[in-house]
């Protein structure tokens, strides 16, 4: 069986899927609180930028992959309106349940689907937009997932990847201290789970940098790929198009 990385640890591919699932089953109930604490609320601005770049209009069909607690799906559902179609999907049942309930509590009724991004259960050329926010780095076969995202996007549509990336070099040392000391400490104090947040830091370091992700998206068949560095490269938004 092939090996892959779970953070810095080398594991079998099947084992990684189980370990990642365990992380998100553990953090689901505290996910939103921890996002605010870990990013100082910046994740809301990163998502607002993504929503603005997406340009969703009434009637659009949108697929939100690894949609978690539904921040993007909530905004897209409002923009697409009753004539649109916005799917909230996640591979993790606990995260999907939290996201579904959160949307319902906001009065937003939109379809949800337990979905593996490497095997998307939708037809070719169906969506105007596919988004994945802070989910790609957890996928074992990123190339296969990106190819699937391209497959289900209509010609003229976009695939958008919002993900942690390579921080500006002068900030690397401070960012390492924050990632490997502060994040696990916060995880232990707030969620009672330091290991999951240690994995978060490690998974960020193992994720392709900005230029490497451009190449990965191009290899998947996406064109005119560009990226926007946010907060000195802590996060980057990559946008690829299908023609």
From Swiss-Prot:
Biochemical pathway: Quinol/quinone metabolism; menaquinone biosynthesis; menaquinol from 1,4-dihydroxy-2-naphthoate: step 2/2; Cofactor biosynthesis; ubiquinone biosynthesis
One BP annotation, GO: menaquinone biosynthetic process
Alphabetical list of InterPro entries matching this protein: SAM-dependent_MTases_sf (IPR029063), UbiE/COQ5_MeTrFase (IPR004033), UbiE/COQ5_MeTrFase_CS (IPR023576)
Source organism, top-level taxon: Bacteria
Keyword Methyltransferase carried by entry: yes
E.C. number: 2.1.1.163, 2.1.1.201
Residues annotated to bind S-adenosyl-L-methionine: 69, 90, 116-117
Pfam families on file: Ubie_methyltran
Catalytic activity field: a 2-demethylmenaquinol + S-adenosyl-L-methionine = a menaquinol + S-adenosyl-L-homocysteine + H(+); a 2-methoxy-6-(all-trans-polyprenyl)benzene-1,4-diol + S-adenosyl-L-methionine = a 5-methoxy-2-methyl-3-(all-trans-polyprenyl)benzene-1,4-diol + S-adenosyl-L-homocysteine + H(+)
Alphabetically ordered keywords of this record: Menaquinone biosynthesis, Methyltransferase, S-adenosyl-L-methionine, Transferase, Ubiquinone biosynthesis
PANTHER family per UniProt: 2-METHOXY-6-POLYPRENYL-1,4-BENZOQUINOL METHYLASE, MITOCHONDRIAL, METHYLTRANSFERASE
Reported function: Methyltransferase required for the conversion of demethylmenaquinol (DMKH2) to menaquinol (MKH2) and the conversion of 2-polyprenyl-6-methoxy-1,4-benzoquinol (DDMQH2) to 2-polyprenyl-3-methyl-6-methoxy-1,4-benzoquinol (DMQH2).
Family: Belongs to the class I-like SAM-binding methyltransferase superfamily. MenG/UbiE family.
Protein name: Ubiquinone/menaquinone biosynthesis C-methyltransferase UbiE
Species the sequence originates in: Cupriavidus necator (strain ATCC 17699 / DSM 428 / KCTC 22496 / NCIMB 10442 / H16 / Stanier 337)
Upper classification of the organism: Bacteria, Pseudomonadati, Pseudomonadota, Betaproteobacteria, Burkholderiales
